[in-house]
Amino acid sequence: DLSHKNHYVVGLGLCMLGSICSAEMARDVAGEVEGLLSHGNSYVRKKAALTATRVIKKVPELCEGFVDAAEALLSDRHHGVLLAACTLATEMCEKDAEVQTRMRSQVPQLCKVLKSLIYAGKSAEHDIAGHADPFLQVAILRLLRVLGRGDADASDAMSDILAQIASNTDGSKNAGNAILYEAVETIIAIEAVGGLRVLAVNILGRFL
């Protein structure tokens, strides 16, 4: 099924693998899943990234084999693929400190995507309550939190975008509150400067 011409059949096979694969099966199919991360169809890339996440949960030592593909996916223009890539990268960084160190090179790219979402105009496809794809914004913030933890340089690189989110996001709707909450969690977790932490505390005060 993973080599079928119909991308929906490939997606179904990937979903099955993600749902039922054992550690032994994960090792057997890891190479095929990695290859599908660069598939020409965005639907297959998204499903492959989600399946790779499940594979890594089963066998954490397979992380290293997915790093190059995961880094490439973080520059994908398709929102669904990018969301799945953030989930994959977050899982990999939490499982392997060496992968976390290597993935820190992606912080500028992630900040660039986040900035484009913050200042994007309303889009019928991705807009929720006036916010451009809050699900993707939350996923990127969670990944930034993992990458910035314990690293001053990475934390400094993401401080500007975190300040912009904290200052400009409308918290009158649930979508905005979800983004603000993740931004606060990220600011608290990373090596943030004092002014940014004050901003986070003020947002927490509004939540109470």
Predicted regions: what is each one?
Residues 1-208:
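Extended alpha-solenoid helical-repeat scaffolds
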